[in-house]
Amino acid sequence: MVVDSYQKKETKKYRNFIPRREQILFLLKTDKDLISQKKLEKKFSINSQEQKKALRRRLRAMERDGQIIYTRNRCYITPENLKIVTGKVIGHRDGYGFLRTETFKDDLWLSIEQMKLCIHGDVILAHIVKSDRKGRNSAKVLKILRPNDVLIVGRYCVDNKKKFVIPNDTRFNFKIFILDSLISNENISIGTIVVVKLRENATKKSKIQGTIVEVLGKEMGTNLAIKIALRTHCIPYLWSKEVEYQLCGIKSKINEKDFKNRIDLRHLPFFTIDEEDARDFDDAIFCKKKTNGEKGWKLWVAISDVSYYIQPDTALDKAASKRGTSIYFPSLVIPMLPEKISIDVCSLNPNAERLSLICEMNLSNKGELITYKHYEAVICSHGRFTYNEIFKIWNGDIELCFKYKKLLKYIQNLSSLQKILKKYNVSKRGIYFENIEAKFILDSNYRIKNISQNIRNDAHKFIESCMILANIASAEFVKKHKSPVLFRNHDRPDKDSIINFRSVLKKLGLSLLGGEIPESTDYSELLKKISTRPDYEMIQTILLRSMKQAVYSPDNRGHFGLSLSSYVHFTSPIRRYPDLLVHRVIKNLLLKEKNLSKYHLYNLNEVTKIGLHCSMTERRADEATRDVLDWLKCDFMQKKIGDVLTGVISNVTSFGFFVRLNQFFIDGLVHIATLIDDYYYFDSIGLKLIGKSSKNTYCLGDTLKVKVISVNLNERKIELSLYMSR
């Protein structure tokens, strides 16, 4: 009989108690024999008919979710014991695919034959079969657990009176034959971009059929590219009636009732410092040097108290959670919160009283965090500045200094603290990247008119440092109270990534210190060492590729990139849901310290689910914006076909190499088939192509002259050729 303390407690509470999924899985994994339902009933002391029915329902749900398998002899077993895995299908335009699982680090290979049984995006149950001749572990489709039910965007076509749609996403490498349409087919001309809903259980074994549910347009432009991205990545972009109704009850101005239990900081000259085109201001800062013989600085970081307006489980909260993050496209913002909240009520606009959550910090003369405290307050921003304005004032711009002469003393205080943080910055202990970013100048149609380099000045870095300090203080606070919260985790690179990165460095005459497990400081030292090399950006890019992606999770695993033992996101609750969650937890803990009623406390299960979802929405936003930017780049490069440009090899693959064009910071492909002077093979360790006869090489960092051959807008591809072979 399997009984734990949880079961004893739950049996007292519920008459028809049944075991948790975790208990069932533990028993199935540890028991060597196949287990029938009768045996499970005996193991868990289940006697009543109600309990047996409830257990049967739970087992069926676990089977449906791929957690267990029901065998022919009417017994249950875990997938692991049968070398069976659950995963998501990732299609490829050439017909084959991969299975992405949580069990394996590398994706499992799905052959063209196996891909006929499923489509991109399906969640399937698969059997792991032996490695193929290329050494890849492959999978055999057993069952589709959750078919991909997303809407697919594609181009409408007609051939021999047959109507079909060719998906924009090449991972769906099939035609969708149109059965019917919610919109009259007569109104849809050939070449129009439409949205299709697939018929249930669609596979390539038979014709894939679907229904047109929306017409997006025909003439490609930035706005249509955004529409496609929103639907391709299933991003919510409309507000429900419930949200609109809730917004009606939120007042734009705060009153004395809202000030209750808040510290009045309206007299302090807080500033917001952001980009020129920023519309939502969720953070403001103020600092001053300590007096009365004390050494160091006081820094106030005021963050908009979004959690005051967005209560848990309301329509606004559910909509914000679903979106997870704001998405910034060139001509459109898809905000996490409606504009009444994001750019009005919660935005720290100049000369407007706003509710805030404060992180007040005491810093040493070296900018180190000594003590901190969080509290609710009301502030009034004394000015909205841009990074460039602050930087110019710090450097003595006469016109701006005169314009802001009343605030000049406080701006110079920021400058003094900035110099300290720049010298002793906490982020310098971690891996500090100096990326060259492209700045796209758009015309009236939101198409690229020109491209320049976006230079980050000291004002950018100062605000970033202040936000990092506030995030560190917030992480320490929640960690101290051991409350379930979302940490921002960045795991150290895995062993294979370190080995591969070191192989590249070796070819370049460089090395990474730190032995088998290098620390962040070892990477930081490497970046300092190569900072003057012409191939600095290229090496930095390879380093970035070797790193893992940061994620949100209640398990505090630290932030490798910043070299921190714990880290949370606290400073952007208007545009990031994890920050809103952190605010709620902090406010709950502040009330707890005062023995007041609790605000809102999450349990571990809730936080885990929210973390997984927010990590996904962050990746989704990145992919959607990348899609639109790639389209804009291709649209711009169409005008450059035939031009000869200089660039640097930014990546080398088995099918060619990518060249980053110096003038535009855009990558294009020189396909291996265009290298006709020799037969080239790929050196995966040295990341280079080598000529078999000539021994000519094309390596990362090589400078070349290339000609723009063609641009494929649909596939977002720019093809180049060598202008002059070596």
Curated annotation (Swiss-Prot):
GO terms for molecular function: exoribonuclease II activity; RNA binding. Its EC number is 3.1.13.1. InterPro entries: CSD (IPR011129), CSD2 (IPR040476), NA-bd_OB-fold (IPR012340), RNase_B_OB_dom (IPR013223), RNase_II/R (IPR001900), RNase_II/R_CS (IPR022966), RNase_II/RNase_R (IPR004476), RNase_R (IPR011805). SUPFAM superfamilies: Nucleic acid-binding proteins (SSF50249). Belongs to the RNR ribonuclease family. RNase R subfamily. Monomer. This is Ribonuclease R.
